[in-house]
Structure formats: structure tokens, C-alpha cells
């Protein structure tokens, strides 16, 4: 099987996954302010929440407004970031934010937030293509909304 993502009917999954989604929703909607409160209301432990929070997402009926956050470590060389930006443009990603730290020991940390609602490929393909860029040392998926 290729890829890490599956679409699964929640009726066949353990109830804990839906409870994690519920806790995330409580936090997102501002109904609770702290993770402890969200997990208590959802009926799960904090450790369960932290274990699954970055891996469980609600399926959106529409692709509008979908965002992905990923981090990279790049070498301090001319053209590396430009090559990554070209890939993001080519696949139809809309860059919402870029945050780049100062290079230390020849490496810089870069964080991207991308609107993926108009992308022509899946996230894994995009990240794999970015990893192939000369000067990109590491690519890490952080979150998806």
C-alpha cells in the first residue's frame, strides 16, 4: 500500500479516535481553553490526546481552506528556498506563511503554512518532491487543518 493516509468509516474505528476529534474541536471552537479540560470533557486521557492529535483529522466535504504546516532544514546555499517555492507553485499550493530562522552552522530551519485546497497532487507527493531538492536536509509534516 502506498502512502500513509486512508479514508475509513468511523463506525469501524475504536471510539477513542472520535473522542480525540471531539477534544480538538472543543479547543478549536474555544469552548475550552486547556487541553486538560478538553480531554476531560471528551472522556480521554491527555496521553491518548497527545498520541493521536497530529494523526487524526476530520474529513472535509469541501477542500476549501485546507492548510498544511511543514518544517524543513535547509543548507545555507543560494537557490535552495527558491527551488522549494517553485515546487509549491508548480503543484498549486498557495503559501500562507514562511518563517525562516537564521542559518546556524550552515543550516536554516524553515516553516511553511500552505493552503492545499487547489493542489494538483497529494501532500506526500509534494513533500517527497521537496526532499529531492539539493540543499534540503529534512522535511517534516507538522499538522493539517
From Swiss-Prot:
Family that this chain belongs to: Belongs to the UPF0735 family.
What InterPro entries does this protein's entry cite?
A: ACT-like_dom_sf, ACT_dom, UPF0735_ACT_dom-cont
User: What's the name of the protein?
Assistant: UPF0735 ACT domain-containing protein CPR_1404
Question: Mind telling me which residue stretches traverse the membrane in this protein?
Answer: none
Its taxonomic path starts at:
Bacteria, Bacillati, Bacillota, Clostridia, Eubacteriales
Q: Known NCBIfam families for this protein?
A: PRK04435.1
Q: Which residues form the ACT domain?
A: 69-144
Amino acid at each position: 500500500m502506498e502512502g500513509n493516509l486512508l479514508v475509513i468509516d468511523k463506525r469501524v474505528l475504536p471510539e477513542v479516535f472520535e473522542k480525540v476529534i471531539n477534544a480538538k474541536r472543543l479547543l478549536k471552537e474555544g469552548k475550552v481553553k486547556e487541553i486538560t479540560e478538553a480531554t476531560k470533557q471528551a472522556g480521554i486521557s491527555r496521553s491518548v490526546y497527545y498520541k493521536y492529535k497530529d494523526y487524526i483529522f476530520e474529513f472535509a466535504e469541501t477542500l476549501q481552506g485546507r492548510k498544511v504546516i511543514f518544517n524543513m532544514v535547509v543548507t545555507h546555499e543560494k537557490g535552495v528556498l527558491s527551488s522549494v517555492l517553485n515546487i509549491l507553485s508548480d503543484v498549486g499550493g498557495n503559501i500562507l506563511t514562511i518563517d525562516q530562522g537564521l542559518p546556524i552552522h550552515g543550516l536554516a530551519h524553515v516553516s511553511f503554512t500552505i493552503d492545499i485546497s487547489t493542489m494538483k497532487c497529494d501532500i506526500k507527493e509534494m513533500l517527497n518532491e521537496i526532499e529531492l531538492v539539493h540543499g534540503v536536509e529534512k522535511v517534516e509534516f507538522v499538522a493539517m487543518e
